[in-house]
Amino acid sequence: MSAPLAEVDPDIAELLAKELGRQRDTLEMIASENFAPRAVLQAQGSVLTNKYAEGLPGRRYYGGCEHVDVVENLARDRAKALFGAEFANVQPHSGAQANAAVLHALMSPGERLLGLDLANGGHLTHGMRLNFSGKLYENGFYGVDPATHLIDMDAVRATALEFRPKVIIAGWSAYPRVLDFAAFRSIADEVGAKLLVDMAHFAGLVAAGLHPSPVPHADVVSTTVHKTLGGGRSGLIVGKQQYAKAINSAVFPGQQGGPLMHVIAGKAVALKIAATPEFADRQRRTLSGARIIADRLMAPDVAKAGVSVVSGGTDVHLVLVDLRDSPLDGQAAEDLLHEVGITVNRNAVPNDPRPPMVTSGLRIGTPALATRGFGDTEFTEVADIIATALATGSSVDVSALKDRATRLARAFPLYDGLEEWSLVGR
């Protein structure tokens, strides 16, 4: 019971050490990834992993829950305070599980769901045909304007009036602009639909007051905790009190069994951090960094190489890059940046002609680097490395760019001293 991981399972210990090295020495720019604080890692690696706690605080189906009840209540209260919500459920294991529970609570199988088309930046759980949301419900979709790549709310309204959905989802996985939540609310009211906002990507910006909050407009709001919120991988739900009973029942027993109390403890810690001035400063640097990258990728030397930025910029933490006129496709561009020490993900652009495993675009995010401490100076350097790689293509001097990326990474140490307290230690 007391032997360290390196002794019990040296194979896993070695892989953890290698992954720590990768995270330290490269620039993480996948928009949905971040670095959980040490305090969150400690909470999630705690003895709470041993505790079963089916039910809600004060209404458990197991004994011995006096301490985990307090943990969950702290997490719920912090979520409500942070987002100005009437109720919170912090038990969903993920953002996808949160969406499943909300739809379970608000709809019945066969009823109509309207969401952003996956090909235009939507998420799998917003009606993709192979996902549960595409199998259980009848789906309609809205998209972006082919010319501006922006969501046209008049078009959304026209679609909603024709389709008459039971639930409208406002949210995205790859859309670089702020949504008009008031307009979505108006449309939902006009057609008699409930409004679910999926703020998984921009919840941290909302918490910092740097992005409009969907909470006053939505019936229910779902989110992850690990993207811009910067906690551990998990989900939560906030919203109006009138939906609390239905959503609590949809989470348990509708979708899940026992909650992961160690993960809920990590959520509580992350939510406490998200209420601090330091967190707000990190979100400001996240936004500024994304704008710096977008501006650099729209410069003439990059545009000449056939690279463009979807919608002509960004309002959030990510930049969506269009490579349709470039010699590079999304896979090739992802691989090239990987070689120079920058991790991004290939991503479809609106109405992408290439298959999903190749794509014609990149999604580039700034949250993880802002968490490391990057500011405008560092983001300007990162932007130039990316721009040089994409504009030059396969003939670029990979070694020179990798040296620049590595110097940046090592200037901002990540998890300094982690080996001394973690199970990875030798």
From Swiss-Prot:
The answer to whether the entry has keyword Protein biosynthesis is: no
- Using the record's annotations, give every residue carrying the modification N6-(pyridoxal phosphate)lysine: 227
Q: Name one GO biological process term.
A: glycine biosynthetic process from serine
Q: What's an example of a GO molecular-function annotation for this chain?
A: glycine hydroxymethyltransferase activity
Pfam families reported for this sequence: SHMT (PF00464)
Quote the record's binding site residues for (6S)-5,6,7,8-tetrahydrofolate. 118, 122-124
Q: Keywords assigned by UniProt?
A: Amino-acid biosynthesis, Cytoplasm, One-carbon metabolism, Pyridoxal phosphate, Transferase
Q: Which InterPro entries match?
A: PyrdxlP-dep_Trfase, PyrdxlP-dep_Trfase_major, PyrdxlP-dep_Trfase_small, Ser_HO-MeTrfase, Ser_HO-MeTrfase-like, Ser_HO-MeTrfase_PLP_BS, SHMT-like_dom
Q: Which Gene3D superfamilies match?
A: Aspartate Aminotransferase, domain 1 (3.90.1150.10), Type I PLP-dependent aspartate aminotransferase-like (Major domain) (3.40.640.10)
**Pathway note:** One-carbon metabolism; tetrahydrofolate interconversion; Amino-acid biosynthesis; glycine biosynthesis; glycine from L-serine: step 1/1
Catalyzed chemical reaction(s): (6R)-5,10-methylene-5,6,7,8-tetrahydrofolate + glycine + H2O = (6S)-5,6,7,8-tetrahydrofolate + L-serine
GO CC, alphabetical? cytosol
The cofactor(s) it depends on are:
pyridoxal 5'-phosphate
Q: What's its top-level EC category?
A: transferase
Q: Which domain of life is it from?
A: Bacteria
For the site Plays an important role in substrate specificity, which positions are given? 226
| E.C. designation(s) | 2.1.2.1
| Subcellular localization(s) per the UniProt record | Cytoplasm
Describe its partners and assembly state: Homodimer.
The record's annotation in NCBIfam families points to:
PRK00011.1 (NF000586)
Please give the family membership noted in the entry: Belongs to the SHMT family.
Biological role stated in the UniProt entry:
Catalyzes the reversible interconversion of serine and glycine with tetrahydrofolate (THF) serving as the one-carbon carrier. This reaction serves as the major source of one-carbon groups required for the biosynthesis of purines, thymidylate, methionine, and other important biomolecules. Also exhibits THF-independent aldolase activity toward beta-hydroxyamino acids, producing glycine and aldehydes, via a retro-aldol mechanism.
- Protein's name in the database: Serine hydroxymethyltransferase 1
Q: Which organism is it from?
A: Mycobacterium bovis (strain ATCC BAA-935 / AF2122/97)
- Its gene name is glyA1
